[in-house]
Amino acid sequence: MSKQEQSNQIHIVLGLGCSGISAAKLLKTEGKNVLVLENNSNKNLLNISNKLKSEGINVILLDEALHINNFTPWIESVCSITVSPGIDWEHIALKELRGKNINVQGEVALAWERLTHIPSVGITGTNGKTTVTNMLNHILKLNNLNTDMGGNVGKALSKIALENMKNNDQELDWLVLELSSFQIEGSPKVAPTIGIWTTFTPDHLERHNDMESYFKIKRSLLEKSSIRIYNSDDQYLSSKRKELPKGIWVGTNQQSLYSQYQKFWIDQKGYIFEDKKQLFHSSILNIPGKHNLQNLLLAIAAAREIGLDDSSIAKSIKSFKSIPHRLEYLGNVNNLSFYNDSKATNFDSSITALKSVPHPIILLAGGIQKKGDFMPWVKQIKQSTNGIVLFGLSANNLKEELLISSYIGEIIVKKNLEEATIASINIARETNSRSILLSPACASFDQYKNYEERGDHFKNLVKKYKLIK
């Protein structure tokens, strides 16, 4: 292809979020002709658009639903289309583009091509993946390994690729990547050195349609990983053990003691073992919840495969703190503790939180309800709470389902999180509850940009009402 032909080739990026912006900048730095298409339009996007244009990146704010006709002006000259993870991989427009043999790829796939020479850990799962990603990155950094963390948490992978390109004199030792199902399905060539599967429960079924499709996407990452690590405490993963590619299994359940396939496990006294070798006591981890012991074992298994000794791992774990919005302890006033678990965007994640903080609890929940089995959540609410305050789009629907299930605690519906927080404080004091827990079990997009914004709002509300000194 001549230089003139190359200059006429257009690389289209879909989406003006963090992933899309990073992908566009990466392509532009490589000298590509870049066009970003965004199907929304507001003041913030306009500001971002103007900034990118000043850097020589073309941006069009469509302000309409994505359609194949949006690509008509460039259909003969498009070289690649890079898709942000928020856009459904099975969108009809993307299917039609693939049908025209156009290179349609996820943002992670674009970045991965520039990073394949760096050893990597790819962490996926319905819940737990963010904690494992942060914990493992913390362990590696404290042991003087040059790492970067990104994907679905931290930096967009394209940003890491761009930084690595500019700082090629400081080669990374390891990439620690959290990879969502959305990112995996658009990046079929991503093949980590180590793959970790934390948990598997219903989530994102409004996009993946059914559990089997969701499972296949997650499994594909492990199939392409050189070393595989699984959580045997997860019932679904354990039930599929014989179908999954061979790997390392970890578990906290007592039956792990007698299982032949556990490599990392915890005994009745809380000591962590690697096969028959005692490593150290699990109490060195200073964050609550049995699920975090599962996360700990997964991180330890990966660190051992990378080559760290057990004493170095233990020393690093002692300084690991809870991650914002994931069972984040905010403090205690008059024997009432406050927890921010805004990351709980599905029922299973909220169940884990309800099991992990002091009972009885006043629960704050609501937002956009996802598909999934409601009843296990209700069962745990009955066991753990004195009352529940609901807010957001699905509040009334959740209330109806709770009433049908014969929940006897107090149920209050409020318009927003601020009103809900005030109500929760009053109920907690009236019922001598020990904890107020924000664990919404729903997506945040009805009232917030993301779960982080929702969690930050809750933390500010706690400060506003002078609950935490």
Curated annotation (Swiss-Prot):
What the record says about family reads: Belongs to the MurCDEF family.
Q: Which InterPro entries match?
A: Mur-like_cat_sf (IPR036565), Mur_ligase_C_dom_sf (IPR036615), Mur_ligase_cen (IPR013221), MurD (IPR005762)
Q: Which GO terms describe its cellular component?
A: cytoplasm
Q: What is this protein called?
A: UDP-N-acetylmuramoylalanine--D-glutamate ligase
**Pathway assigned in UniProt:** Cell wall biogenesis; peptidoglycan biosynthesis
Tell me which UniProt keywords the record has, alphabetically. Answer: ATP-binding, Cell cycle, Cell division, Cell shape, Cell wall biogenesis/degradation, Cytoplasm, Ligase, Nucleotide-binding, Peptidoglycan synthesis
Which of the seven top EC classes does this enzyme belong to? Answer: ligase
Q: Which GO terms describe its biological process?
A: cell division; cell wall organization; peptidoglycan biosynthetic process; regulation of cell shape
From the UniProt record, list the reaction(s) this protein catalyses.
UDP-N-acetyl-alpha-D-muramoyl-L-alanine + D-glutamate + ATP = UDP-N-acetyl-alpha-D-muramoyl-L-alanyl-D-glutamate + ADP + phosphate + H(+)
Which purpose does this protein serve, as stated in its record?
Answer: Cell wall formation. Catalyzes the addition of glutamate to the nucleotide precursor UDP-N-acetylmuramoyl-L-alanine (UMA).
Q: Which residues bind ATP?
A: 125-131
Which SUPFAM superfamilies does the protein's record reference?
MurCD N-terminal domain, MurD-like peptide ligases, catalytic domain, MurD-like peptide ligases, peptide-binding domain
Per its UniProt entry, which superkingdom is the organism in?
Bacteria
User: Gene name on record?
Assistant: murD
Molecular functions per Gene Ontology: ATP binding; UDP-N-acetylmuramoylalanine-D-glutamate ligase activity
Query: What HAMAP family does the record point to?
Result: MurD
* EC number from the UniProt entry: 6.3.2.9
Compartments in which it is found:
Cytoplasm
